[in-house]
């Protein structure tokens, strides 16, 4: 069993600041087994609402190839229409990584939709203290698809910096 506690100047998720520039306090409580099975809860404070996430997964390695399959439920007690769930598959090899986040279950974002078909994909590379990640969100709900590039630098194991830029966006409008 392990835990974490942190503070951030914003809630940075999938290339966007979703906290409207507000500082965040976050923490987790995790259980992991030597077999590769793990589960946990993560939570954050936000000014308008609180979020807690529940997750379970299994990860391991076959030689130099790492793999992970997990399920996560994002929960917003004060805004249940924004709750969503995803199945995540990730692979890594020699500093390279790739992941797919596949929307399942109920979904809201303030709409009447209950069918989450949103998908998010990433490819990345890390070397020493530097990292680059390209993420693409394919949103079914309102066609606000976008691609972002993140550049990161880890000053220490506990302090890192990430810059992100949305490089391609489709706001769903015609024309």
Task: Name the predicted role of every residue range.
Residues 1-175:
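Outer-membrane beta-barrel proteins
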């Amino acid at each position: 069993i392990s835990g974490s506690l942190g503070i951030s100047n914003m809630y940075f998720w999938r290339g966007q600041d979703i906290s409207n520039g507000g500082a965040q306090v976050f923490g987790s409580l995790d259980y992991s087994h030597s077999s590769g099975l793990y589960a946990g809860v993560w939570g954050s404070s936000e000014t308008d609402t609180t979020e807690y996430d529940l997750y379970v997964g299994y990860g391991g390695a076959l030689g130099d190839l790492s793999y992970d399959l997990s399920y996560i439920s994002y929960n917003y007690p004060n805004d249940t229409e924004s709750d969503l769930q995803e199945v995540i598959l990730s692979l890594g090899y020699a500093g390279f990584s790739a992941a797919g986040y596949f929307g399942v279950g109920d979904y809201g974002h303030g709409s009447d939709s209950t069918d989450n078909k949103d998908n998010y994909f990433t490819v990345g590379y890390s070397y020493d203290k530097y990292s680059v990640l390209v993420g693409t969100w394919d949103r079914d709900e309102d066609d606000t698809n976008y691609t972002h590039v993140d550049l990161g630098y880890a000053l220490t194991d506990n302090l890192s910096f990430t810059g992100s830029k949305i490089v391609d966006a489709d706001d769903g409008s015609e024309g």
